[in-house]
Each structure stands twice: as structure tokens, then as C-alpha cells.
Amino acid sequence: MIPVAEFKQFTEQQPAFKVLKPWWDVLAEYLTVAMLMIGVFGCTLQVTQDKIICLPSHESRENISGAPCQQLLPQGISEQMGGLRELSGLKNNLDLQQYSFINQLCYETALHWYAKYFPYLVVIHTLIFMVCTSFWFKFPGTSSKIEHFISILGKCFDSPWTTRALSEVSGENHKGPASGRAMVTTVTTTGAGSGKVGEGEKEKVLIEPEKVVSEPPVVTLLDKKEGEQAKALFEKVKKFRVHVEEGDILYSMYIRQTVLKVCKFFAILVYNLIYVEKISFLVACRVETSEITGYASFCCNHTKAHLFSKLAFCYISFVCVYGITCLYTLYWLFHRPLKEYSFRSVREETGMNDIPDVKNDFAFMLHLIDQYDSLYSKRFAVFLSEVSESRLKQLNLNHEWTPEKLRQKLQRNMRGRLELSLCMLPGLPDTVFELSEVEALRLEAICDISFPPGLSQLVNLQELSLLHSPARLPFSSQIFLRDRLKVICVKFEELREVPLWVFGLRGLEELHLEGLFPPEMARGATLESLRELKQLKVLSLRSNAGKVPASVTDVAGHLQRLSLHNDGARLLALNSLKKLAVLRELELVACGLERIPHAIFSLGALQELDLKDNHLRSIEEILSFQHCRKLVTLRLWHNQIAYVPEHVRKLRSLEQLYLSHNKLETLPTQLGQCFGLRLLDLSHNGLRSLPPELGLLQSLQHLALSYNALESLPDELFFCHKLRTLLLGYNHLTQLSPDVAALQALSRLELKGNRLETLPEELGDCKGLKKSGLLVEDTLYEGLPAEVREKMEEE
């Protein structure tokens, strides 16, 4: 006997492939097994038993009828028996070899080919059916995609995250504030708009949390591991979807093999119905063997004809059923849009409205999965949802950033508030909202932030920074922050990315915006209305605006500080500045200004002006600053100013003057008449000498002359007895006057980078000057007398 297992190699498949076999493929598989058993059984009988047995006919050649075996038919037998004739056996005078010869000869010549080869044909046709059915599981171009899909599908189905994601979505309206522990929820009712969970899903959702809660110590560790595995699954699903949706080779291959099976079914059915009647029990055989055996006609018995005829009809029945399944498969393939798959029902059941529809081979495989068990596609859809992925990221974040770890990052910022700074995270940990002591929250390069209701736990929050971090704020959270938030800093590539809710924070005192206007909007520089910001005192805008935004005038009645940083783009229209009647501080940095704007001189309340990084060459307009009677700080640094006009003396209320990083070579003597000056910064210029009139600045406390070309200092400079800081580094000084002893308040003296050979020992008389405040080469310091050094090193 030939065991059926020998043919296993033709149809051997991975057990996991069963999920891609709809009911008709399973039925066809069982039918092929039955047909194969028929064929193998017939072949076994054919090989192990006699095929045909022949006896010679004794009638003379002239009397031979058309059918040598006619006398053996039932009618002939009954007639002979009716005569009640006594019969005796006939001697044929043939030996065994002659019988064997006649049997073989008649088998080959007289027996119809269908009767001879029927079992072999059954085996061959069945094997072809098997190959057609499993070909796409073996062909490299399709099997690789199928194996990859089955692998991912099994992991997605078994992943605990699938159940938890469905649970989270279904019960989100009933869940309390999120914590850093496992996000496990028992679904009892369905929230509005979140859909219903299927019965099978609901059972799993309820069972899983019970199992988790029973072992709390293990859950956290396992949840973290499961979260990492689910995160990897999301990436695999994304890449697999992109790869499989590109083509339809699986769909085409399945159609081709089905069409081939249908064609073969019709061919088998036709020729079997035609030739099945050729299987007969008695076979007439006429062969010219009279010279060898003495007989020319024989009557043969096909010993397996009766069994083969029954097997043939049984085989035809199986083939018919098999053909019907193939025809139904073709109907299913062409009647339905199998290259598109919609998750609409899954979206309705789970509430995950962002699950995308898929196409091509991806859609076709999901249709096949639905024929096996639609639960697979429902659970697989979880890993196509961005909502689910974001929740998973949130869970992983909560595990990674515990409240204890976040508290380690707390520190005081420049405004003195307790700040938590988070940078380049995949999301915002829910554990942040457990730190009620946080006063300032800085979020940088965090994608798609959505503030949860837990934001209301940050009762001390007064400052928020969003740097390249888009944020959505629910209405309830807007109400919470509207009167509570005092400072907000927002930075994006373009200003139109700034969230609109920012301009509705009516309790805001400081607004800092950074981003570019699109090229077509830069000249107009349109900004959202600021009318809601009734308490705004500070407005900072870093962009490429062509003019001062008109909406700045919305806060003209209470704005005290305005900063415009234009990154070198020329600011043309500044007339809006005239309306800022209470403005105290104005910064126009890198605005491409070549002259001091006249609109500034209308700001009667102005106290500080900063014109850094512009293209100022002449400051003749400085005379008009006498209208700004409250101006105490003027920063004209980092420009191209070549001289200071004489009427600088009109600025008698000026206390701080910054002229560093310009092209000054001389100073007017009238500068000494600015008697209110306490700080004068002239570093990084080309000054070769100083006017003696600087000694008239009796209020001067800070004088910076570093990085110039000074060769000597006027003795009158040491009349500035209140001078605390004197920076003379990197000049051409060859000596320091002993009159430096008159500077009793001096606490910081820089002399590095000069041509000094010795230091005057009178430095020891500067009571406030210590070693830490003296910046000079070590060799020069060591040249001071020991008692001077000891005095300077005293605490």
C-alpha cells in the first residue's frame, strides 16, 4: 500500500496559514484529500492484484459472433440453464505462461485506456488541484508577504495592548486622571461618541484587567515590556502597510489559480462523464495468436471494473462539489471590491475614528481574514490607529517619566519660578500634572501635545513655553489657564502655527512669539487680534515683519515693553509705535535700520531703548531724545556708528549708554556733560585716546573700554571716585597710573592683553579690589610686592 502521507510534500503548509483559508478553501482541501484517497486506493489495487483474466473462445473462426463474450451475458446463461443440459469442462490445452501472455496482451490492446489509467488520472488531477490551491503559499513573490502578514497578525491578536487600547477608547469618558501606572479600565457603559465594543471584545476587555490587578507588583514590569513590544508592532504594521499596498500580486495570483482550477474542473468533468461507461466487467479480446496459443478470440474479465465504476462515480461527485466551490470563489472574487477594505464597522464599534481604510493586497488579505474570523481584523485595526499609537506612547511615557524623575528636573528659571523643562519627547507624560508645585512649564520639540483635563492640577502654573511644540487645549483647560497664566512663550517655524487659544488668555502679562511670516505676508505682517489680552504688559515678537503689526495698538493702553527682533529683515513702517503712550521699554533688534526712527521720539514714557544689530552709521537724531525725558538707558551697540555727535550732552537724564561693537575712533568732550551716566560701554571700537572730560562723570560706576587701541589713560579718569568696574583689557597700554589708588570703590579691574611691564603698588590702596576681581597676567600679579598681594588675597 502507498500511504497518503507520501503526498504530504505537495500540500504541506504552515499551520498559521489557516487564517487565510476561507471556508471554501477548507472544504476544497478536504475534497482533495478524499479524491486523493480514491486515487491511491485504486492505484494500490491496480498494482497488487490481477488486472484482467482471459479465457479462449472455442467457437470456430466462421461462427465467431460480434461479441465473443455474448454467451456469458445473463441472458445467455439463463438460456443454457433452461435447457438442463449437462455440461462438462472444456480443455484449452494452454499452460500458465500462455495465460499470462494472453492476459497482458489483452490488457494492453482490448481494455479501454480510461479503465486502465483511471486511478492514476485521479491522483494526477488531485495533485494538480493541491498545487494550485497552495501555490501562492509557496511562490516567493507572494509567500514572503503572507508569512510577514501572518507573523504580524498573530502578534497583534495576542498583544495585551489590543484589549487595553479598546478598553481605553471605550471608557475614556469614565476614566479618572491618568497616572504613571498601567492604563487598565473595566468597561461597564459606553461613552458618548465612542461606539460599542463587540461581545467577544467586551469579554476580553473585562477579563484582562482582572488578571492584571491580581498581581500588582508584576503588572508594572510586564506593562513596560508589553508597551515596548506594542511600539515595535506599530512600526512593523506601518512599514508592512506601505510595502503591501503598493501592488496586487496576491489578489492576481489567487484569481489565476482559481481560474485554473475551474478550467481543470470542466475538463475533468467532461471526459469522465464520457468515458465512465467504458469501465465494463467483460471485455472481448481478438488477437492473432492462433499460431502460439491456437486461439484468436478471448473473453476477458476486468476484475476491478465493478469497484472502479463505483469509485469513478464517487470521484465525479467529489469533483462536482469541488467545482461548485471554485465557481463560488470566482463569484466572490469578481462580485465584491476585494481591493478595498473599509474599517467602518470597526470604527463604529471601537470609537477609533482614525482607523484608515486600506487597499490592494492588504485589503484582499483582510477580506480573507474576515472569512476565517472577523475578530482578527478588528484587533489588527488597533495597530492602524494613530489614536491607539498615541495612547501607547503615553503609557510608555508614564512608565519612563515617573513623578520622582520629573522632580529631579525642577529648577528656578530666570524669572525665579520653579520650572520643569522637557525636550524632544514623543509626547507629554501624564505624570507632569501630578507635580502641583510647578510654576513654569517649558516644552520643546514635542509633537502634537494635547493637554488633558489633569492640567487643572497645576494650580501654581503661571508660565508656559511651547517651542516647536504644537498644542491643543480643550475648552475646559482654556478656562483654567485664561486668568491664571501670566507668561507664555511660543516658537514655531511660521507664526501661523501659533495656537489661536494663546490670544484668548486675558490674564496674560507677557507674550513672547517667535516665527516667520510667509514671504507673501511678511510685508503686511498681520497678527491675530490682541484685544482679549487686557493685562498684557510685555510683547516680544521675533519674525521677518515688514512693519509693526497693527494689532499691537490693541494693547497700546497698557503695554509697557515691546521687543521686535527682525533677524535682519528691514522694518519699514513704524508709525504704529506713536500710539504706545505708556511704553517704557522698546527693543528694535536686527531690524535693518539705517537711522533712528522718528516715531520713537513721540514715546514720552520711554525709559529704555535698544537698537542692537542694525545698520546705524549716524546718530545725529540723538538730539531728539531730549523729548524722551524719562530715557535712562540707550543701547546703540553692534552697529556701524563712526562718531558721537556733540549734542549728546542734551541727554542729561541718561544713566546707561552702550556704544560697544561700533567704529568709534574718538569721543566728543561733551560726553562728559552727561552727568547722570552710571554705565558707559565703549568696548570693541577703535578708540586711541579718551577726552579728559570723562573725569566729570562723577556718577560713573561701570566703564568698559576693552578691545580698543588705547595707549594711555587721562589722569582725570581717576576722578570718578564711584567707579566699581573698569575694563581695560586688550588695549595698547604700557603703564597704569598710580592715581588708580583714588578709586576706592573699585572691585573689578581688567588689564589682560596690554603691554604692561609692571603694576603700580598703589593697587593695594583700592580697598574694594581683591585678587578675584583683578584680571591680569600671572607674571604681572606676581610682580606686585608681597604685602600688596597679601592684602588683596585677604577675605
UniProtKB/Swiss-Prot annotation:
It is found in: Cell membrane; Endoplasmic reticulum membrane; Lysosome membrane. Glycans are attached at N63, N301. SMART domains: LRR_BAC, LRR_TYP. Disruption phenotype: No visible phenotype in normal conditions. Impaired response to herpes simplex virus 1 (HSV-1) infection, caused by decreased ability to transport 2'-3'-cGAMP. It is a multi-pass membrane protein. It catalyses: chloride(in) = chloride(out); iodide(out) = iodide(in); taurine(out) = taurine(in); 2',3'-cGAMP(out) = 2',3'-cGAMP(in). Gene3D superfamilies: Ribonuclease Inhibitor. Residues 44-116, 286-312 are extracellular. It comes from the Eukaryota. GO terms for biological process: aspartate transmembrane transport; cell volume homeostasis; cellular response to osmotic stress; cyclic-GMP-AMP transmembrane import across plasma membrane; monoatomic anion transmembrane transport. Disulfide bonds join C54-C300. One of its GO terms (cellular component) is monoatomic ion channel complex. The keyword Ribosomal protein does not apply. Pfam families: LRR_8, Pannexin_like. LRR repeats lie at residues 535-556, 558-578, 582-603, 605-626, 630-651, 653-674, 676-697, 699-720, 722-744, 745-766. Belongs to the LRRC8 family. The volume-regulated anion channel (VRAC) channel forms a trimer of dimers, with symmetry mismatch between the pore-forming domain and the cytosolic LRR repeats, a topology similar to gap junction proteins. Non-essential component of the volume-regulated anion channel (VRAC, also named VSOAC channel), an anion channel required to maintain a constant cell volume in response to extracellular or intracellular osmotic changes. The VRAC channel conducts iodide better than chloride and can also conduct organic osmolytes like taurine. Mediates efflux of amino acids, such as aspartate, in response to osmotic stress. The VRAC channel also mediates transport of immunoreactive cyclic dinucleotide GMP-AMP (2'-3'-cGAMP), an immune messenger produced in response to DNA virus in the cytosol. Heterohexamer; oligomerizes with other LRRC8 proteins (LRRC8A, LRRC8C, LRRC8D and/or LRRC8B) to form a heterohexamer. In vivo, the subunit composition may depend primarily on expression levels, and heterooligomeric channels containing various proportions of the different LRRC8 proteins may coexist. This is Volume-regulated anion channel subunit LRRC8E. It comes from Mus musculus (Mouse).
